[in-house]
Amino acid sequence: MYPLNSIPGRKDVAFIKAKHGKGAAQNGRHSGSCAQAPASRWKQVLLTLLIFIALLALIGGALWQNICYNRTHYTAEFYQVHSRKLTQSCRVVFLTDLHLREYGQDNCELVQDIHSLAPDLILLGGDLVTYGEGSSYDNMLSLCSQLSEIAPVCGVLGNHEDELYFLDGDQALVEKFTAAGVTILRNQEARYTVRDNVISILGVEGSPADFYNYGASTFMDSVEPQTDYDLRICLAHVPTYFPEHLENYSFELGLAGHTHGGIVRLPKIGPLYSAEEGFLPDYAGGSYGLANNATLIVSRGLGDSSWVPRINNVPELSVIDID
């Protein structure tokens, strides 16, 4: 007989057992790693989700702050316009689309800012009120009265005043403006002498679709031959009035509002939407050249009339220096 440890093939058996035992241990380790892998993936998913939520919160907070800021603040935008005949420079302040908003009690902040700008003329682009928001316009009329103590004030009606006038039959609306010291131009001209310069202000009523129906074309034809002025400014509430019709006439400066700056202004793209032009409008805030070599300034306005908030679009008080 052979000793136990000298049995032929015994070492081989022991080696095989050891090998199998090592493999089993390795298999045990692999089984543990597989059990941990799903937990690791869930941690990654949870972390990604938390980062996404944090980014959404930051973006939402920034948007909300922007919206709130745009409801309580405005900026003075300065424009420079050159005139061929003006002998002395003058300053015009243009405000539009206030929609009954107040900046300070009784618009004291707005009035103080305009007073400090020392304008020679104050021009209104319409929509100082909002149709359907009650019949009391005391704050608007008070603002007009305060402005008339600073400089001569004239302007045009916007579509919201037109709705009050034509749909609600508020025939006294223009009289209320007049009593507050404002000259409302409804296809009419007003003239002012400013620093020895005669300034002609044309006020065109309605929208571009109304040009041939309610007297605007007849009015513009009637004043076209005039040359006895040093500067002519044309007012219209809707900016597309100018490229569609008004740039065929003689004036040096056009002023309009209505678009609220496109409501949302996208970085590197510009205004998002206007009622007349749809998405990505051409005329929704800023300075533009017209075919008659005039400058058109479209104000972003001072207020809002819809539930859609302004985003990246601070309300504007336009200040135009003409020399």
Where are these predicted regions, by residue range?
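N-terminal membrane-anchoring alpha-helices
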Residues: Y2-L86
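Membrane-embedded segments
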Residues: Q88-L185
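Active-site metal-binding loops of divalent metal-dependent hydrolases
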Residues: L95-L100, G126-L128, N159-E161, Q188-E189, ...
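Short, flexible loop segments at the rims of nucleotide/cofactor-binding pockets, characterized by
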Residues: L98-Y103, T130-G134, S207-N213, R232-C234, ...
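Conserved acidic residues
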Residues: D120-I122, D230-R232, E252
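Binuclear metal-dependent hydrolase catalytic cores centered on His/Asp/Glu-rich metal-binding motifs
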Residues: D168-V182, V194-A236, F242-E244, W307-R310
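Conserved beta-sheet core of the metallophosphoesterase superfamily
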Residues: P239-S318
